[in-house]
A protein has these predicted regions:
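Sequence signature of WD/YWTD-type beta-propeller architectures
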Residues: 2-4, 25-178
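Bacterial N-terminal signal peptides
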Residues: 10-22
Length: 178
């Protein structure tokens, strides 16, 4: 004679154990999320990338020209042209930021001030970068306003001063400390 108590225990265990095992399946990592894809392959350093809002271009800093310059890389599908050097000055350029419409790049250059000034390079026009700020002091990390009429940046008037965040209107050059 089979005792119902023992049978019922095994029956419950037979149902519960597979259910627990089902919820204990190890998660598989998604290769798209965990495997970065190398998109530059220079013998020197490539860093500080900024990607356009439409994802078609990237501007980055590289020392492959002998000093730190800005370079443009096309990110579209298929075979792309070689990366294009954007700045050609012997001073270091860095901290690029592509405008929301993808037509201009704000960046910091040490060409007129060893502490850094902000310049804008029009990607659609001939000619070199135009200075936005060329004053004594340190200006860094430019960021475009959404409407592209102003830049926000950090500045320090002297090596002992505390950094502050400022805004500069591109038309007229009015600076406002925030």
């Amino acid at each position: 004679m089979i005792r119902l108590g023992k049978f019922r225990g095994w029956a419950i265990l037979a149902i519960v154990f597979p259910a627990i095992s089902f919820f204990n399946i190890p998660a598989q990592a998604s290769p798209a999320l965990n495997a970065p894809i190398q998109i530059t392959s220079n013998p020197g350093e490539d860093f500080a990338p900024t990607v356009s809002a439409d994802g078609k271009i990237m501007v980055y800093v590289s020392d492959k020209s002998g000093n730190l310059d800005l370079w443009l890389k096309n990110l579209g599908p298929g075979i792309q042209p070689p990366d294009q050097r954007l700045t050609f000055h012997s001073a270091e350029d860095g901290s690029p930021e592509i405008s929301p419409d993808g037509k201009r790049v704000a960046f910091v250059s040490h060409r007129s001030d060893p502490r850094g000034d902000i310049y804008i390079l029009d990607l659609m026009a001939e000619g070199g970068p135009k200075p936005v700020i060329q004053k004594p002091g340190e200006e860094r990390d430019p960021v475009w306003s959404p409407d592209q009429t102003a830049l926000y940046f950090s500045s320090r008037s002297s090596s002992t001063a505390q950094p502050v965040i400022e805004k500069i209107e591109l038309e007229g050059g009015k600076r406002t400390e925030l």
